[in-house]
A protein has these predicted regions:
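Membrane-interface alpha helices of multi-pass inner-membrane proteins
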Residues: 133, 153, 164-188, 204, ...
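Specific aromatic-rich, kink-prone transmembrane helix
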Residues: 145-161
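Alpha-helical transmembrane segments and terminal signal-anchor/GPI-anchor hydrophobic tails
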Residues: 49, 54-58, 64-65, 186-298, ...
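Membrane-interface junctions at the ends of membrane-embedded or membrane-associated helices
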Residues: 22-24, 159-164, 307-336
Length: 445
């Protein structure tokens, strides 16, 4: 856990330093470049950090290595991710490379998105870590790739341009098909979230909340059949504190809707995103698997909350207004105080969410493990570099076996000397016989 707080502290210090002397585009881009290097490197060098690392993505990459002719469409992974794995496997047989490539891809896309669409890249980056989106990227790799790709559809959603919006969502769905839920959202978003609509949403939410089992039973008959009602991810429930936190985040955006829409009427999109982030997190308290749909909407918070902060900050000339005692500056002083309280509330609330998320460790990122510190990995790299040395050990054992008494059957002796199959050689350390869906505990040396 200390690793992540050091990381957060470094990002906070950098954010403060880069804002000295005022913000400008060049400083924003340099800051994002440094953030990209720090976050991508930390994620790329992880080992068994994130539940899906050990029993999903590392074995999945080894499967592609062992069967390079596997079809893009003949696997339970989506074709976009399968294509990515095949491309990585073409250049490297080191399974860690899939985590290097996906880390660079995910963090790179987030930084590009913030560079293009965030009104305050510094606050966006801090919220990206505080709201556990960074830790989500270490666990739900395919869905995070889909989610960050889908973020680029928001500008087209604002402009109500369905075709480019649809194309981006379809690309996202090639990494995780759950992204297709964003297609009907386009039409839902055509209805602004007014107070009356909000009341209707609340009523519908209440009805759906107490009928989730019927809905899940119907859906899993046709889609995601592995998530039937007996599945552990369906039976398990998500903790209420996360739903409460998501409700607070929604209320922040909802109560600031007037300022957001005053700046740009199309910004009501963020209010809808905030509501559905809360909606699916709430449904996750019934069936935890439903919370995963909130990912596509949660990723918008590092855009919407900084935008609201920017709107508030534009209502006064500078932070010095807090200390200006002139009567004519009363309004500026009040606006500055409100903005300061808002920022403090967001950061303190974010820290609380961050601490609780790491304590509960839903993404399996605690403790952080670095691949370079694992002794077996050095042996793994040596075997990749010198594969011709591997058969030497069984050959040396042949001598004492040949000297056995004559009555020892030769066929049995020869079977003892057989080399492991390539599939066995390529298995991950401590990966044999791992039950599907269970995290792997790797003891530290």
């Amino acid at each position: 856990m200390l690793t992540y707080y050091i990381l957060l502290g470094v990002l906070a210090i950098l954010a403060c330093l880069f804002q000295i002397g005022g913000k400008n585009r060049k400083k924003d881009l340099i800051f994002l470049l440094i953030v990209f290097v720090i976050l991508a490197t930390t994620s790329a060098l992880r080992y068994s950090t994130g539940y899906d690392y050990s029993y999903t993505y590392a074995p999945g990459f080894e499967e592609v290595l062992n069967n390079p002719d596997i079809s893009l469409f003949g696997h339970h992974y989506e074709p976009g991710y399968m294509l990515l794995e095949k491309m990585v496997a073409f250049f490297s047989s080191n399974y860690q490379m899939i985590f290097v490539v996906t880390s660079v891809l995910i963090i790179g896309l987030f930084c590009i998105n913030y560079a293009k669409y965030s009104s305050n890249v510094y606050l966006s980056v801090i919220l990206f870590v505080l709201l556990s989106e960074y830790y989500c990227s270490m666990n739900f790799i395919r869905q995070t790739i889909a989610g960050v790709i889908a973020l680029f559809a928001i500008p087209f959603l604002k402009k109500k341009k369905f075709l480019p919006y649809l194309l981006i969502v379809l690309v996202a769905s090639t990494f995780h098909k759950s992204a297709l839920i964003l297609i009907p959202f386009f039409f839902i978003n055509l209805i602004p979230l007014t107070k009356i609509v909000f009341v209707i949403y609340c009523a519908v939410t209440a009805v759906l909340y107490f009928n989730t089992e019927r809905i899940m039973n119907f859906v899993t008959q046709y889609w995601y059949q592995g998530y039937h009602l007996d599945n552990v991810h369906v039976q398990a429930t998500f903790e209420w504190p996360f739903a409460v936190a998501m409700l607070i985040e929604f209320l922040i955006v909802f109560l600031g809707a007037s300022k957001l829409t005053k700046k740009d009427k199309s910004n009501y999109v963020y209010v809808n995103y905030a509501f559905f982030a809360f909606f699916f997190t709430l449904m996750g308290t019934r069936h935890s698997i439903l919370d995963r749909l909130s990912v596509y909407f949660e990723f918008a918070f590092p855009l919407s909350i900084p935008l609201l902060y920017t709107c508030l900050k534009e209502s006064f000339p500078s932070w010095w207004s807090l200390f200006d005692k002139h009567p004519e500056e009363k309004e500026n002083r009040k606006n500055a105080a409100v903005t300061a309280v808002f920022l403090a509330f967001v950061l303190c609330g974010g820290l609380a969410i961050h601490q609780y998320a790491l304590t509960m460790d839903h993404h399996g990122v605690v403790p952080y493990r670095c691949i370079l510190n694992q002794p077996f990995y050095q042996e793994y790299l040596e075997n990749l570099e010198n594969p011709q040395d591997e058969p030497a050990e069984p050959a040396e054992e042949a001598a004492p076996i040949i000297e056995e008494p004559v009555d020892t059957p030769p066929p049995e002796t020869s079977t003892q000397l057989e080399m492991p199959t390539p599939q066995e050689e390529n298995k991950l350390p401590e990966q044999t016989d791992i039950p599907e869906g269970m995290p792997v505990e790797v003891p530290l040396p």
